Amino acid sequence: MHDILDLDRYPLDQPGSEGYATLVERCRRALDTDGLFNLDGLVRESVLDGIVAEVAPYLRDYAFTHSRRHNIYFLPEVDGLPRSHPALTEFDTVNHTVCADQIPESMVCRIYEWPPLAAFLADVMEKPVLYTMADPLARANVMAYHDGEALNWHFDRSEFTTTLLLQAPDAGGDFQYRQGLRSDSDPNYDGVANLLEGRDRAVTTLPLAPGTLNVFKGKNTAHRVTPVEGDRDRIIAVFSYYEDAGVMFSEAER
């Protein structure tokens, strides 16, 4: 894995070492403060073109085009909110997805399945263990966003999301988030409305370079990817890890 990942800078394969402990502590602090952490340049720049070249034919010829109009909650309605409430404003999300079962021998899947990565994430999250997902489709996806396409405002349903940016677009495709917009006890619908209507000045734009692993707690932090601009796609891998072994999605969840 040393030929793919910069394990000199990020010693994920050396648990118990001082460098590993320092990295885990740094990532924990970032999660507590910012709700996310990045391992910038985890994937070596020298192999990024090769990774993209592996998945590009599948994205071109076999990707599933996911096009959906949705609100920030991914729900048809929210108890106590009229349909006209601005917190239920709808947006379009479009991307093109290749699933792990289509690229089982790819470097993307090798990275996802590499045991030290899941062990490192578990240490940062202070969990006993994290497992790769058993679902052959949902465990790891590669998504492409073409010119004009975006992942619009939403809250995540899972505790955390792990992504690996493989290719940045010519312009646009920026990751934006609004930390602490709601809590488990306060949905803050008026605050959500302010965000969606463009009045929230606390939105953060996070520049991500190809090769960056990003771990993000998005359950109560609204986030989006702005529309891509230009002929160069935004290509990103999404990795799913769980505290329970053998997790599968239902047909409806897929």
Predicted regions and their residues:
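Cytochrome P450 catalytic domain signature, combining two hallmark sequence patches
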Residues: A56-S67
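Short beta-strand His + acidic residue motifs that chelate non-heme Fe in jelly-roll/DSBH
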Residues: L151, A222-E229
